Amino acid sequence: MGSILTLGYSACSPFRPDVADSATIKEAWDEFSNPADSARTKVWRFHGETETTREGITADLEAYKRAGVGGVVYYDQVHGKGEHALPAFSVEWWEMLKFAASEAKRVGLSFEINLSNGYVAGGPWITKALSMQRLTASDTIIRGKQQFAAVLPAPGDDEFWDIAVLAFPVPQNQWMTNNSQRPKVTCNLPGVSAEDFFCKKSRLTTIPPQQPGKSVYINLDFETSFTARSITYRVSKRSKASTGAMNVPGAPADEFYGSSYVKQPPLGQLEVSDDGINYSKVCDLKPIYQAAASRWDQKTVSFPAVTGRYFRLNLHDWCLAGDQRPEMALGNVTLSSRARIDQWEERAGFYSEYILKNLTPAYTDEEIIDLKTIVDLTSKMGTDGRLEWDVPEGDWVIMRFAHESTGGPSKHGRANLKGLECDKMSVEAVTTQWNNYAARMIDTLSAINVKPDGVIMDSHEAGAQNWTPGFEQEFLRRKGYDLFSYLPAMMGYIVGSVTETDAFLYDLRRTVADVISDNYFGTLQTLCNKAGVDFTAQATGNGLSLVADNLQAKGRVQKPQGEFWAKHIHGSYDIKEASSAAHIYGKRIASAEAYTDAKFSQSLAELKNLADFAYAAQVNEFVVCASAYQPWLDKYPGSTGGGRHYCLNRNNTYWEYSRPFWDYQAR
């Protein structure tokens, strides 16, 4: 009995027999026998797939109450076309929201709202300047002993904001690429221009599936010796990123793999030849995995300097048997004499992956940038990008750094209020999101005496960011040194040494994670406190598609939340992360998005087994993902969330018999 009471009372507030008396034991037993509504499971109630009716709202909420559900979260999440759904924030939408909140209060259910239309924090009020940001740069190599006066190349294709201009001496023969040297390029792919693989454009070139062992060759003939140290390319992503808080259980290893991750073979190899006949391998061309909603598709592979007239990409056997998408899309290939950090895009936070052993070669001092030689030319560039500089002797590279929007969008909301995701490191951007969505709903419902009980936040799935306005001050304050001289390292160049550069990139990622925890989740918690509502957040979520410290981020919110799905039978859930954060940071509630994507074919007995697993991981609040809003009284199964079932609703044949299932969870 004692162990059951301990588990039921609170996973994060253990029962204390040393201070208990008969009164407290009786009180605990009474609470266990007749759980308070606050202990009951809640549901995410997805709207936006269908029309909205008052009778449907009432029927849903009364059915929840009958079954023993404790509360609902109003959440506009759309996976189908939503053809008959009301536009968000329309007069009719507001009327239905107010009616739903009023009905929830009438029947005795808690009523919470989602932070955003869809997920996770964005909308049309988020301009490019307030959206997620990343560093970008252009470079120009010039001869010394001259008065340089010219407009530097734009560092971004669209809107961007300048940060700094730096210059450093580099021998010209160590800054060459196939773009500067213009080799003859050919390929053995009928109907495809080899030039398409190398030109800078947004669309990649599709390579059709090949028979096992058959190669597609993309050839470069420099007509003279060329020394290469790195290759950069964009390629279609495959499988699912190994990054994930939802790791497949296993023994400690150098690599950890997330749910649905399948290790992919290389795309092929880069090869070199002196005669164009006999080739030797330079390096494997590594694949890129699909991180949650990340648009980033560029990778750089570094290798010791290799010289030859002929180079080729030998592409073969890049997919596994049974792959649903056996073709490959490739483009923006750059073979370069520049020494780069291997896979710098991940280490600099453009793309979130586990940071494994640094495989960058041990380049010589002559091949890397000497920190002491970097010159700050920021003050010499005008607002129009024109730089005037008396260039010292030698070959010099000028880099113009700026930040730009990543373009990361909000997902699965009503069409008229979708937009860019807010900057996760900007208090201004986060507050703008709050003021334009959650605050409006809280104020409107408060005016009719049905103020929401809380605000919830889903997992982040909009890719990574590594910059925000004022980031340099955040870095200086937190790390104690100026990052400006290391900006080239954020674009993959080696500054000082490989070890020094890697140490800086660690500090960079650590700072990004810290600022996201403080300025994103910390700000939202402050805003919820001021509004007098609870805050539950999947900070930052199981997909880990941006650089973050999930335990730290969860510690910034009132109720840290993980999730467990109904289909991941191997137990790869991130709920233990939520309960760990609750223990570390002294939170009373460790919440869980529960039974995600449960199907009509799954019984309550199956779901109970999952519940027991989650309780053993010490979470003590369930919020079902999801229960699709049902507008009709005479259609079955009714709305299925765009085909995802969302079956825990009044149209399920076992609903009226499910009270023991919900009572069990409350205890």
Task: Give residue ranges: language-model regions.
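Carbohydrate-binding surfaces of carbohydrate-active enzymes
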Residues: 21, 40, 57-58, 72, ...
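Bacterial Sec-dependent N-terminal signal peptides
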Residues: 1-22
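Acidic/histidine-rich, surface-exposed loop or edge segments in extracytoplasmic proteins
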Residues: 36-46, 76-83, 407-422
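Solvent-exposed serine/threonine-rich low-complexity stretches and specific carbohydrate-binding patches
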Residues: 282-290
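N-terminal carbohydrate-binding accessory modules
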Residues: 15-39, 47, 55
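Active-site-adjacent "subsite" loops/lids of carbohydrate-active enzymes
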Residues: 123-202, 290-296, 353-442, 472-512, ...
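Aromatic, loop-rich ligand-recognition surfaces of beta-strand-rich domains
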Residues: 199-278, 295-370, 459
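N-terminal cofactor/phosphate-binding cores enriched in small/glycine residues
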Residues: 50-85
